[in-house]
A protein has these predicted regions:
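Aromatic-glycine hotspot motif
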Residues: 1-47, 54-133
Length: 133
């Protein structure tokens, strides 16, 4: 059973990295103006989406006891869009009117959180491996 979990965590880590890489490749094709515009009230700007998904991963890590020390300039709590228990919610129609996060902030934040997620998965994987002996 431990080997199955070990293999699953390795596979999950690879899939996470691949998905995040592909998403970034798609995002990198956008011009700045295209990344921050909100075409309709029911859809978020691509830049917002890029940062919000990272915020979601951050919250999932914290739920599992990971202490994340973000640099002050990366305090992106306003990316909460659904979860009232976390804090203030910026409504979907307003996201395109809110000039933050900048694309640079989104990419830095995303990179920071990606490293945290991969570290978390590797730690879990190492713990599974230790259980084999």
């Amino acid at each position: 059973m431990t080997q199955v979990l070990h293999d699953s965590l390795e596979s999950l880590t690879k899939e996470f990295k691949s998905t995040r890489r592909i998403t970034l490749e798609i995002f990198s094709q956008l011009r700045h103006e295209d990344a921050v515009i909100q075409a309709s009230d029911f859809g978020s700007p691509p830049n917002w989406h890029l940062a919000h998904v990272s915020w979601f991963f951050q919250k999932m890590l914290e739920k599992h006891g990971v202490k994340i020390s973000l640099p002050k300039e990366m305090n992106l709590a306003y990316l909460n869009s659904y979860y009232q228990k976390y804090d203030f919610i910026l409504s979907k129609p307003q996201r395109g009117r809110f000039p933050r996060p900048t694309i640079r902030q989104s990419l830095q934040y995303r990179s920071f959180i990606d490293k945290e997620v991969v570290g978390f998965l590797k730690q879990r994987n190492a713990n599974c491996h230790d259980d084999l002996y």
